[in-house]
């Protein structure tokens, strides 16, 4: 008989031939993640109107080229009637605070620095789509993620004030913005800022894991992939919070199928870390026990769940057969887990979903290596 490697090569070649289809590109909402593209447009209309108004206010102060919004892995907050803003880039680990105030710019910059350092760990009290001031109370969101000039974490007003004075005296920079001068400072985050943020949610993740029988490492990997542990995360897809839950789809499913209630979660509900992690993990429970319950091998099931969280159950099944869902499930179940992984990362109709599964599985490995004694 030929060696085992020969049969492995034949099998791999067969899989490639079976799934070597020129798929048309789709988006995250094309395959069962949203009910209809038209519904998606309707759902995001209010958000679009809000952002259009918001961007108009930004352009008046900063110009067309300097419009910045909060996203999945960056926090952007305007204050001071749009004259000042802060951006926290959670992937780069860098905080940029700047002002274009024409009068007393250093005073305005100091206020923006203090506000940023003391912004509370409560997204419900921070309006990302206005220049509304932030009520500074409770533990700061950036606590232990930023250290002052004495290498101390910043929790209280006196320390934030002192650090702001230090930054303005030593680190202030200027640049031209729309024919105006902007004054800004850059603050590096601590090296382990990812871990510092993840620690904040350890108890919530543990509870959700036990409640829905979804592994902790998977929940952590999803959060890191979706938001970089940014509870303020918001995306063009009308997704909110740590696990980037879309209210109209995953949120509505969880309310109906798990919580036995009508309607869908509000953005405010999903900005709450406890609610968000519970809802996102509950959706994995639905994927596991309802939409993908026929997947037989537990590892193949997990790969399918991860892919479906991003690209919908339909996207998973279309990877194996575009016209016959029952046959798609049979084909999926005929493969070994590594072959299912190969198909979902090479032949899924959505490029984003292909990359997504790779990212999540890599972050899972990273999490487990960090937590192995």
Go through each PLM region and give its residues.
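Active-site metal-coordination segments of metallo-dependent hydrolases
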Residues: 193-196, 267-277, 351-352
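Short, functionally critical alpha-helical segments immediately adjacent to catalytic or ligand/cofactor-binding
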Residues: 213-234, 245-246, 280-281, 305-310, ...
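Secretory-pathway/luminal and periplasmic proteins that interact with or process carbohydrate-rich
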Residues: 227-236, 252, 311-323
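Catalytic and binding regions of secreted/periplasmic enzymes and modules that target cell-wall glycans
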Residues: 276-326
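Short amphipathic alpha-helical segments at helix-loop
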Residues: 186-190, 261, 265-272, 297
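Substrate-binding/active-site groove segments that recognize
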Residues: 236-264, 278-286, 332-335, 360
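Active-site-proximal structural scaffolding
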Residues: 235-238, 298, 353
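Cell-wall glycan-active module
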Residues: 1-224, 289, 293-296, 322-373
